[in-house]
């Protein structure tokens, strides 16, 4: 099997050296070249024709985002962004994902060498995922048209969504058309701390419904979406007649915290047939067992189809496990989940 050919673009010589060490330590990949800036990278891409590009977000001579935008227009290829953990870094990274980057890794704030080498397996996994990702599914999506407001539903109704690689854009596409009369949505997207708040704030500006990073103990309200905070699990719990959110630091599940399975299992238990479960693009099997539990508890469950997924991992696992009622294209997810949640009952509250 041929090796995954990687090109790293970073203005830091140390980072280029570390990335080279990491990539070359894996037998299935090789660093074919490195570049200190996008202008040099342009020539190296033509020369070496890499399978995956790792790209520093903030660089001199040409901004990483400007370069990414041009690259995706002229020569689309899988890109993994390398980002700082700052507020600005998370904003820029989210924009990069919108422009077509497959995924990102964060630079440790202290001890770059030790920190990056500790990320060795994660970086390799993200490069492997990027090499297999569907670029056709990751073309920048146009804003979906707003769905008509349906009847107000019982506050017992809610939607649970899980996603990973490619999920930030898929979630935007699902939430943007939702009317204010939508039920509450609980969302687990695999993301590090610091990024989930920026992600929620970004969606809040784009959507009619309110979108926020979830807080422990807060009441779950219709017309709002709650994003699990990075590195913490989110569960649905009850307080009397009301739903509320439970945030905790339990151990990683399926190597993830937050974990989609943790959310889905809690929704199966607390909401049962009053819920709809949705599993979107992502690598691995997180969410498959939880989605089966939701289906067995009477919930309607949807999986994104392969053609519209950046990575058809999590949906495939959920389908194979028997947890999925219906497989739909990303463009139909919003409409279908609202139709299914409304089919049960329409109670004015």
Swiss-Prot record:
Pfam family, one: CheB_methylest
Disruption of the gene: reported phenotype: Mutants are defective in chemotaxis. They exhibit very high tumbling rates.
Regulation: Methylesterase activity is activated via phosphorylation in response to negative chemotactic stimuli and is inhibited in the presence of attractants. Activation requires both CheA and CheW.
Post-translational modification as stated in the protein's UniProt record: Phosphorylated by CheA. Phosphorylation of the N-terminal regulatory domain activates the methylesterase activity.
Record's keyword annotation contains Aminoacyl-tRNA synthetase: no
Gene3D superfamilies tied to this protein: 3.40.50.2300, Methylesterase CheB, C-terminal domain (3.40.50.180)
Class of the enzyme per the UniProt entry, highest EC level: hydrolase
Keywords per UniProt: Chemotaxis, Cytoplasm, Hydrolase, Phosphoprotein
GO cellular component: cytosol; plasma membrane
Enzyme Commission designation: 3.1.1.61, 3.5.1.44
Sample GO molecular function, one term: phosphorelay response regulator activity
Catalyses which reaction(s): [protein]-L-glutamate 5-O-methyl ester + H2O = L-glutamyl-[protein] + methanol + H(+); L-glutaminyl-[protein] + H2O = L-glutamyl-[protein] + NH4(+)
InterPro entries: CheB-like, CheB_C, CheY-like_superfamily, Sig_transdc_resp-reg_Me-estase, Sig_transdc_resp-reg_receiver
Stretches assigned to the CheB-type methylesterase domain: 152-344
Enzyme active site: 164, 190, 286
Biological process terms in GO annotation: chemotaxis; protein deamination; protein demethylation; signal transduction
Coiled coil: none
Domain of life: Bacteria
Subcellular location: Cytoplasm
Domain Response regulatory: 5-122
Family stated for the protein in its record: Belongs to the CheB family.
Chain's role: Involved in chemotaxis. Part of a chemotaxis signal transduction system that modulates chemotaxis in response to various stimuli. Catalyzes the demethylation of specific methylglutamate residues introduced into the chemoreceptors (methyl-accepting chemotaxis proteins or MCP) by CheR. Also mediates the irreversible deamidation of specific glutamine residues to glutamic acid. Catalyzes its own deactivation by removing the activating phosphoryl group.
Subunit organization: Interacts with CheA. Binds to a C-terminal pentapeptide sequence carried by certain receptors.
Comment, domains: Contains a C-terminal catalytic domain, and an N-terminal region which modulates catalytic activity.
Protein known as: Protein-glutamate methylesterase/protein-glutamine glutaminase
Gene name as annotated: cheB
């Amino acid at each position: 099997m041929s090796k995954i050919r990687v090109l790293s673009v970073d203005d830091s010589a140390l980072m280029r050296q570390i990335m080279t060490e990491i990539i070359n330590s894996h037998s299935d990949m090789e660093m074919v070249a490195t570049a200190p800036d996008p202008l040099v990278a342009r020539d190296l891409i033509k020369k070496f024709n890499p399978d995956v590009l790792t790209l520093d977000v903030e660089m001199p001579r040409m901004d990483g985002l400007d370069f990414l935008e041009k690259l995706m227009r002229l020569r689309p290829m899988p890109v993994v962004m390398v980002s700082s953990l700052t507020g600005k870094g998370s904003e820029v990274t989210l924009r990069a994902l919108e422009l077509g980057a497959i995924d990102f890794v964060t630079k440790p704030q202290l001890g770059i060498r030790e920190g990056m080498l500790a990320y060795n397996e994660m970086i390799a996994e993200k490069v492997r995922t990027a090499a297999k990702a569907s670029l056709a599914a990751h073309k920048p999506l146009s804003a979906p048209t707003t769905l008509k407001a349906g009847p107000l539903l019982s506050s017992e109704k809610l939607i649970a969504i899980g996603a990973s690689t490619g999920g930030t854009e898929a979630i935007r596409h699902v939430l943007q058309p939702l009317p204010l009369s939508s039920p509450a949505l609980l969302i687990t997207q695999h993301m590090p701390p610091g990024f989930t708040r920026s992600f929620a704030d970004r969606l809040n500006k784009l959507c009619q419904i309110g979108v926020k990073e979830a807080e422990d103990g807060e009441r779950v309200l219709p017309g709002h979406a709650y994003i699990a905070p990075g590195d913490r699990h989110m569960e649905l719990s009850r307080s009397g007649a009301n739903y509320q959110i439970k945030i905790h630091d339990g151990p990683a599940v399926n190597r993830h915290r937050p974990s989609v399975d943790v959310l889905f299992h809690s929704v199966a238990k607390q909401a049962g047939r009053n819920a709809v479960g949705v599993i979107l693009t992502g690598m691995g099997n997180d969410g498959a067992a939880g989605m089966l539990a939701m289906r067995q508890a009477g919930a309607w469950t949807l999986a994104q189809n392969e053609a519209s997924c950046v990575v058809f991992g999590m949906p495939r696992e959920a389908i194979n496990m028997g947890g999925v009622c219906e497989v739909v294209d990303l463009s139909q997810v919003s409409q279908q989940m609202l139709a299914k949640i409304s089919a049960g009952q329409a109670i004015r509250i």
